[in-house]
Amino acid sequence: MQQNTNVDPQEIAKFERMAETWWDLNGEFKPLHLLNPLRLNYIDQTAGGIFGKKVLDVGCGGGILSESMARIGAIVDGLDMGEEPLEVARLHALETGVSINYVKNTAEAHREDHREYYDVVTCMEMLEHVPDPQSVIQACCDMVKPGGFVFFSTINRNVRSFVETIIGAEYLLKMLPIGTHDHNKFIKPSELIDLVDNTELICKDALGITYNPLTGIFKYTSKVDVNYMIATQKVD
């Protein structure tokens, strides 16, 4: 059963239009392909390894993170509301021989039959694209087992993030299609932690990610002024 109350149709349509290029390493999702090894390593290391664990990837899109987690032995469900990205994800998994269960649904609706079901839940680059981030965070909390980990990543809201992610990445470097992001929907780390604190999740770690346009390389950084991830754990 789908609950569409926490879905922005314009956001869904935006990624539907880009779906065909999801696995083009030099296409519109090149930044995600470059960023993904850092995300995967952070998730795997912080969660104490995800091999053999049940993992839910909320807002999975075309499956970049989902596939990488499945490749290192996780049992992955990928969740998204975009039909085209999910079709791309299913086809790519079939072509590469990776077993992933992709589902078209919201986190809130998926929760109905999956309370405390997953060992790990990931919600990466997704919160800034929904009307109510708190609702998604609560659903993620409800679906992870006590003691399990939930990972979030998003973009800080300040002048630097506006310059780097919108003016730089969208207009100057053409790394992303113009209109991919809305600066007003970016979430400050303090705001995200406040949202997390409203649930049974506890923030265990925060880590920034920086991009060097000259080398084309993403790196970890202690600064969370633009892209950042947080690791949370459900109270046991």
UniProtKB/Swiss-Prot annotation:
| Methyltransferase among keywords | yes
Q: In which pathway does it act?
A: Cofactor biosynthesis; ubiquinone biosynthesis
Reaction(s) this enzyme catalyzes, per UniProt: a 3-demethylubiquinol + S-adenosyl-L-methionine = a ubiquinol + S-adenosyl-L-homocysteine + H(+); a 3-(all-trans-polyprenyl)benzene-1,2-diol + S-adenosyl-L-methionine = a 2-methoxy-6-(all-trans-polyprenyl)phenol + S-adenosyl-L-homocysteine + H(+)
GO biological processes: methylation
The UniProt record gives the binding positions of S-adenosyl-L-methionine as 39, 59, 80, 124
Q: What are its E.C. numbers?
A: 2.1.1.222, 2.1.1.64
Q: Which Gene3D superfamilies match?
A: Vaccinia Virus protein VP39
The entry's keywords: Methyltransferase, S-adenosyl-L-methionine, Transferase, Ubiquinone biosynthesis
From which domain of life does this come? Answer: Bacteria
What GO molecular function annotations does the UniProt record carry, in alphabetical order?
2-polyprenyl-6-hydroxyphenol methylase activity; 3-demethylubiquinol 3-O-methyltransferase activity; methyltransferase activity; polyprenyldihydroxybenzoate methyltransferase activity
Classification via InterPro entries: SAM-dependent_MTases_sf, UbiG_MeTrfase
Q: Which PANTHER family match?
A: METHYLTRANSFERASE, UBIQUINONE BIOSYNTHESIS O-METHYLTRANSFERASE, MITOCHONDRIAL
Q: What does this protein do?
A: O-methyltransferase that catalyzes the 2 O-methylation steps in the ubiquinone biosynthetic pathway.
Q: Which family, according to the similarity comment?
A: Belongs to the methyltransferase superfamily. UbiG/COQ3 family.
NCBIfam families recorded = UbiG
**Name this polypeptide is given:** Ubiquinone biosynthesis O-methyltransferase
Protein source organism: Shewanella oneidensis (strain ATCC 700550 / JCM 31522 / CIP 106686 / LMG 19005 / NCIMB 14063 / MR-1)
